[in-house]
């Protein structure tokens, strides 16, 4: 019985195996020979169906239930058949309205755009190379910082440009008429040949001018301060009213009559004038050799006042010391109130010699400051003596 069952099972398996192989060959050959040309033209759905049937046949031979798989495979077949290859899209090579276009008419950053910004040849473009109204343009008429602009600032040949090389009213211009710091400007400050220029070389009214008429610190200015030959110049060499002038009549520090620090001025301060202060021969000069009210080392009044002020003792010390020696004080000088340092000593006046000690006061006494040896010296003596005593005691006990 066992042999029969084994034979039956083996025969069933062999039959299923032959059926599976046969079905596989049929479907695979059909799939290969659908178009008969090449493998690229084989339909993907046919290959999928052949593989599904092959797996189903193998499942039957092994005793599996292929119904669920077939039922699950049916919708997959429909989905695979519905998939169609997409048509390739055509590339549009021409876009008429795009930005950043190479030849666009209104494109930004365009190479030849008429109104493009940063355009190379744009008429109204900013930063344009040849734009008429462009800023920072090379040949723009009204461009700022333009090379040949008429009204451009910092322009090389601008008419009213600031810091322009040949501008008429330009500041700091080389040949400007009214330019400041101009080389040949008429009214320019710090100009080389300006008429009213400050610090001008030949300006008539220029300050610090070499030949200016009213220039300050001018070399030949008439009213210039610190001028070499100016008439009213301060610190002028030959100025008539110049201060510190060498030959000025009213100059201060010169030889003028009213000059300060003048060498021969009659009323000059510090000179040889009659009213000069600190003068060598001045009659009323303070601090001179003939001063009447000056304090001198040999003056009796001044020296006496200084000595009296230095010898006046402290009132509090006098009162305290008087209370201590009231009963013993006489017409002779008492001992010093201290044994070291500065103290006070006193005695009775002649008219208070007969007064009772209780009636004495500060007005009845003569006082003065007394100075004794420094207290540090006494302390040193005491300390040294104590040291010697200690050494002697130690020597005796040892």
UniProtKB/Swiss-Prot annotation:
Keyword match Membrane: yes
Organism: Plasmodium cynomolgi (strain Ceylon)
Main location group: membrane
Residue segments, region Required for the binding to heparan sulfate proteoglycans (HSPGs) on the surface of host hepatocytes: 81-89
Lipid positions (GPI-anchor amidated cysteine): 375
Biased composition, class Gly residues, residue ranges: 284-293
Positions of the pro-segment in this chain: 376-398
Compositionally skewed regions (Low complexity) per UniProt: 97-110
Domain called TSP type-1: residue spans: 324-376
Domain comment quoted from the record: The N-terminus is involved in the initial binding to heparan sulfate proteoglycans (HSPGs) on the surface of host hepatocytes. The N-terminus masks the TSP type-1 (TSR) domain which maintains the sporozoites in a migratory state, enabling them to complete their journey to the salivary gland in the mosquito vector and then to the host liver. The unmasking of the TSP type-1 (TSR) domain when the sporozoite interacts with the host hepatocyte also protects sporozoites from host antibodies. The TSP type-1 (TSR) domain is required for sporozoite development and invasion. CSP has two conformational states, an adhesive conformation in which the TSP type-1 (TSR) domain is exposed and a nonadhesive conformation in which the TSR is masked by the N-terminus. TSR-exposed conformation occurs during sporozoite development in the oocyst in the mosquito vector and during host hepatocyte invasion. TSR-masked conformation occurs during sporozoite migration through the hemolymph to salivary glands in the mosquito vector and in the host dermis.
Glycosylation sites: 339
UniProt keyword terms in alphabetical order: Cell membrane, Cytoplasm, Disulfide bond, Glycoprotein, GPI-anchor, Lipoprotein, Malaria, Membrane, Repeat, Signal, Sporozoite
Disordered as annotated region, ranges: 50-110, 248-310
Function: Essential sporozoite protein. In the mosquito vector, required for sporozoite development in the oocyst, migration through the vector hemolymph and entry into the vector salivary glands. In the vertebrate host, required for sporozoite migration through the host dermis and infection of host hepatocytes. Binds to highly sulfated heparan sulfate proteoglycans (HSPGs) on the surface of host hepatocytes.
Gene giving rise to this polypeptide: CSP
Gene Ontology CC annotations of this record: cell surface; cytoplasm; plasma membrane; side of membrane
Region (16 X 9 AA tandem repeats of A-G-N-N-A-A-[AG]-G-[EA]): 97-240
Name of this protein: Circumsporozoite protein
Biased composition, class Basic and acidic residues, residue ranges: 66-93
Compartments, record wording: Cell membrane; Cytoplasm
Bilayer topology: Lipid-anchor; GPI-anchor
KW Lipoprotein (keyword) present: yes
Signal peptide: 1-23
Disulfide linkage: 336-370, 340-375
UniProt xrefs under SMART domains: TSP1
Pfam families: TSP_1
Family: Belongs to the plasmodium circumsporozoite protein family.
Segments annotated as Sequence repeats: 97-105, 106-114, 115-123, 124-132, 133-141, 142-150, 151-159, 160-168, 169-177, 178-186, 187-195, 196-204, 205-213, 214-222, 223-231, 232-240, 241-257, 258-274, 275-291
